[in-house]
A protein has these predicted regions:
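Acidic/histidine-rich catalytic cores of soluble enzymes
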Residues: 153-236
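Acidic (Asp/Glu)-rich catalytic clusters
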Residues: 16, 43-49, 63-80, 96-111, ...
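C-terminal helical cap(s) of enzyme catalytic domains, especially alpha/beta-barrels
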Residues: 278-301
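Gly/Pro-rich active-site loop or hairpin
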Residues: 91-92, 131-142, 201-265
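Conserved, mostly hydrophobic/aromatic
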Residues: 54, 113, 194, 224, ...
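Active-site acidic/histidine proton-transfer and metal-coordination neighborhood
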Residues: 96-191
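Active-site-proximal loop/turn and secondary-structure-junction residues that shape catalytic pockets
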Residues: 30-32, 58-62, 84-86, 117-121, ...
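N-terminal pre-domain/capping segments
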Residues: 1-103
Length: 302
């Protein structure tokens, strides 16, 4: 796999200083803005000042939708969230996929790449698969995933931030935060912590919302996700549906406040609310600003 000549040089502590501070943003994925009643990211930014940047969820076989293309045409800040690569599988970083990735990043000009570090597909990659299972939480699973992160960074010239995936059940004895902390160090990279996903893990294991955060290298946390979740039950099993609604659970806020206050390199926070109306989403932005206060990263002037 050829290395991009723009590949970030130096160790993480050198590279992180070159990353821009993006502020408070919104996420989207293909077709989300076209859903009935869904917010328009451009309007959220222009009319309400609530979208410093756009995190674009991308499955290469689908490409960019009109909302993402319109944002990119303005030259506004973005990040690229992959939805179709298993980082621990070298075959996923094939020449065709990397070529498509480079073409889309040339359009979006993202500050970095990010995405859930889990199983996006089982077997051959196929359009619309988007399985998304969490990784098996064992030490042996770390090295292959770290190798994928390093390879993707070298091939694209962009930082790659692994995100903790959602799940109703988690296999393996390790705590999720121990796994991701060790992964970040092995890959010499930063982290994207999804606070709603983390609460799903803690709840599934019967743990306190802040369990093991004292063991996570918080100086590697670059981005946070905050999203609504809906508690539900299936045949006696308590679950949280990761619905990206407007009802953010108290434990999710607790996690976000704790991490934001202790992460000196935090550069971006996303409110995941893409399929809700602007009117429904605005209170979430106000609450996020109030709760994170001085710890909320402020976007750099263009």
């Amino acid at each position: 796999m050829p290395q991009d000549p723009r590949a970030p040089a130096g160790d993480f502590w050198t590279r992180v200083r070159a990353l821009p501070t993006l502020g408070l943003g919104v996420s989207t994925e293909y077709g989300a803005a076209a859903a009935p009643g869904a917010l328009d990211p451009r309007a959220l930014r222009l009319a309400h000042g609530c979208a410093d940047f756009l995190e674009v969820g991308v499955e290469l076989s689908r490409g960019l939708d009109p909302a993402a293309l319109a944002w990119a045409a303005e030259g506004w800040p973005t990040t690229y969230h992959f939805l179709d690569v298993n980082l621990d599988d070298p075959a996923d970083l094939d020449d065709g996929w990397l070529s498509g990735l480079r073409a889309l990043t040339a359009q979006l000009r993202p500050a970095w790449l990010c995405g859930d570090a889990g199983l996006w597909h089982f077997g051959r990659r196929d359009r619309g698969h988007m399985l998304l299972l969490p990784p098996i939480l064992i030490p042996e699973a770390i090295a292959p995933m770290a190798a994928g992160l390093r390879a993707l960074r070298a091939a694209t010239g962009l930082e790659v931030l692994p995100e903790n995936p959602p799940g109703a059940a988690f296999v393996g004895p390790m705590h999720l935060l121990d796994f991701f902390g060790q992964l970040a160090e092995a890959a010499d990279t930063g982290l994207l912590i999804d606070c709603a996903h983390l609460w799903m893990f803690q709840r599934a294991r019967g743990l306190h919302p802040l369990e093991a955060l004292d063991r996570l290298p918080l100086d590697r946390v670059i981005e946070l996700h905050i999203a609504g979740g809906r508690p539900t039950e299936h045949e006696g099993l308590g679950l949280i549906e990761d619905d990206h609604g407007i009802e953010v659970l108290p434990e999710t806020w607790q996690i976000a406040e704790h991490i934001a206050a202790r992460s000196p390199n935090l550069k971006a926070v996303i409110i995941e609310c893409e399929r809700n109306s602007i009117e429904a989403a605005l209170p979430l932005y106000a609450e996020c600003r109030a709760r994170l206060g001085a710890h909320l990263p402020r976007a750099e002037a263009p």
